[in-house]
Design a protein with these regions (language model features):
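N-terminal signal-anchor/first transmembrane alpha helix
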Residues: 1-32, 183, 248, 273
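Transmembrane-helix boundary motif in ABC transporter permease subunits
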Residues: 22-25, 72-106, 118
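Periplasmic/extracellular loop-to-transmembrane helix junction in inner-membrane transport proteins
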Residues: 32-77, 224-240
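Generic hydrophobic transmembrane alpha-helix motif, especially the helices
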Residues: 47, 51, 92-97, 101-154
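Membrane-cytosol interface at the C-terminal ends of specific transmembrane alpha-helices
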Residues: 76, 88, 126-176, 185-197
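Non-cytoplasmic
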Residues: 115-119, 123, 127, 131-132, ...
Length: 275
């Protein structure tokens, strides 16, 4: 048996410390300001220091984590629903419909997602709802491509053909035979997009068109820290470290889910009948 590599335990250990600090920070108030504690350096009273308004940085990191994770998951769900629906529609209707939808996918792929999201979010006035809509309307394409390819590859398989000859409707075939094989294939992409969404949320927050103050958000925290970086560098460094760790954890989950994705794609089996 080979010795475990350092990377096999280092990142999980960092993630565990990350989780413990988040759990502690959630017990603190992220909004309460105290000007007499303004720009306090990290210490026993404030483990990560305070910002220019005297707010606890650890509390804002922890509550910003919840907000960013919630937004990222919401964007993933919306993107999944849109992408799967469009991908399956393209495969099922084929012909001109498939060509038109594929053209839209190609067009969306050729444009940088963050730039389109930036324009949409700014046009919608900023805020969390605008953020969700902008990133969902630009994030569905990858899911749609996988859904379309999976539906095309499975619709002529023996078990799908048998279900069709037995009188199964289009909706039944998609729900009972295509979708169960599609979801495992999307697991790796979901984990990867989770990390990408966190980065995009932070980027839009940094530019001031994402989550609005005084709500805590990592990108907005880094933007607020710019005028004070020379005297209080922890204001930008701490959320930057948490953003990095969060992205690395998402990449680690992507790598591990890749094994399950390969197994799911090797030999699709018919769905088990419900009792």
């Amino acid at each position: 048996m080979s010795a475990p590599r350092r990377s096999d335990w280092l990142l999980p250990a960092i993630a565990a410390l990350f989780a413990l600090s988040i759990a502690y920070g959630l017990t603190l108030d992220p909004i309460e300001a105290s000007l007499r504690n303004s720009l306090r350096a990290p210490g026993p009273d404030f483990p990560f220091g305070t910002d220019h308004l005297g707010r606890d940085v650890l509390a804002r990191i922890a509550h910003g984590f919840l907000r960013d994770v919630g937004l990222s998951l919401t964007i993933i769900v919306c993107s999944l629903v849109i992408g799967i629906a469009i991908g399956m529609l393209a495969a099922e209707l084929a012909g001109a419909t498939d060509r038109a939808l594929t053209f839209v996918m190609d067009l969306m792929t050729s444009l940088p997602q963050i730039v389109i999201a930036l324009i949409l979010a700014a046009h919608l006035g900023g805020g969390e709802l605008a953020l969700i809509l902008a990133l969902s309307l630009t994030g569905w394409v990858k899911y749609a491509r996988i859904a379309r390819a999976t539906a095309f590859s499975l619709r002529e398989r023996e078990f799908v053909t048998a279900a069709r000859l037995a009188g199964g409707s289009r909706l039944y075939l998609l729900r009972r035979h295509i979708l169960p094989h599609l979801l495992p294939l999307l697991s790796g992409l979901v984990a990867l997009q989770f990390g990408h969404n966190i980065l995009n949320i932070a980027a839009l927050g940094f530019l001031g068109i994402g989550v609005q103050p005084p709500a805590p958000e990592w990108g907005a925290m880094i933007a607020e820290a710019r005028p004070y970086f020379s005297q209080a560098p922890w204001l930008a460094i701490v959320p930057g470290i948490y953003l990095f760790v969060m992205t690395m954890v998402a990449l680690m989950l992507t790598r591990r889910s890749g094994v399950r994705q390969e197994r799911a794609s090797v030999d699709p089996q018919p769905a088990q009948p419900t009792r």
